[in-house]
Amino acid sequence: MNQRNASMTVIGAGSYGTALAITLARNGHEVVLWGHDPEHIATLERDRCNAAFLPDVPFPDTLHLESDLATALAASRNILVVVPSHVFGEVLRQIKPLMRPDARLVWATKGLEAETGRLLQDVAREALGDQIPLAVISGPTFAKELAAGLPTAISLASTDQTFADDLQQLLHCGKSFRVYSNPDFIGVQLGGAVKNVIAIGAGMSDGIGFGANARTALITRGLAEMSRLGAALGADPATFMGMAGLGDLVLTCTDNQSRNRRFGMMLGQGMDVQSAQEKIGQVVEGYRNTKEVRELAYRFGVEMPITEEIYQVLYCGKNAREAALTLLGRARKDERSSH
């Protein structure tokens, strides 16, 4: 591979970053995968697979491992960031001085900025300026299934139509990976953050033993919360019926591959927050997202009762069953009301 002609540089060598890099390489593209831990990258290079997260998926020959950040960023103008939301801004500030002048940035990170609840587009603009094209991909994607080549579909939104078209062409694979374009940059970002919160609630409900009826009600009312917050931020309501909204929400709330759901199940079964996080062993994005989504909802005056009760469990020590009963005990209302 020429050092400057890769189709994409992927920043973040966890399970999802690796899965996306594999998918791109499988599409016939030269891809560079960078991770912050040189020892981890050396292990990936030696094994030619991510044995920790994706042990049964060998790397295509066109997937190149790189531990030097400057070299990785010089390899392509297209940068795909796949890191936890709480380090998103820090990573962008780290890569900014090393990016090519023609660089374009897309992220697969789902969440909001830690503490402030800002959308990641605002974090990116602050870190990188107003000139660089930005994009986001989001949708129902478990890393293991994506890496295995099982059928998957996502949404793609960008501030730049040329970038959106190029990304759709790079990522889309008719056999296994369908990429839908969507002009709603805000909505595609927001869905991925709120669904993490609702998934914890769905897990809590199942952990308590409330059954399928309760889980489905929680998903449906969670979608209503997502849509209300989206409307307040200027998103298109139709986005939340697509891959980045309902699609991701259903997947994350119903399948035990979801860390957020498993975390919630442990809480519903009586485990404390810290012990549940330690047992998961990886980042539970919904833990921080709950605080951030609640902050955003307060800022825009949007009532989100499910999010509020999950916050009370995670940060105020409320019992999961008590939180569920609080929701069930809410006053009667019209299903279509705005609160």
Curated annotation (Swiss-Prot):
The organism of origin for this protein: Escherichia coli (strain ATCC 8739 / DSM 1576 / NBRC 3972 / NCIMB 8545 / WDCM 00012 / Crooks)
Entry-linked InterPro entries: 6-PGluconate_DH-like_C_sf (IPR008927), 6PGD_dom2 (IPR013328), G3P_DH_NAD-dep (IPR006168), G3P_DH_NAD-dep_C (IPR006109), G3P_DH_NAD-dep_N (IPR011128), NAD(P)-bd_dom_sf (IPR036291)
Transmembrane domains' residue ranges: none
Keyword Lipid biosynthesis belongs to the record: yes
Described purpose of this protein according to its UniProt entry: Catalyzes the reduction of the glycolytic intermediate dihydroxyacetone phosphate (DHAP) to sn-glycerol 3-phosphate (G3P), the key precursor for phospholipid synthesis.
Identification of the protein by name: Glycerol-3-phosphate dehydrogenase [NAD(P)+]
Superkingdom assignment: Bacteria
Signal peptide: none
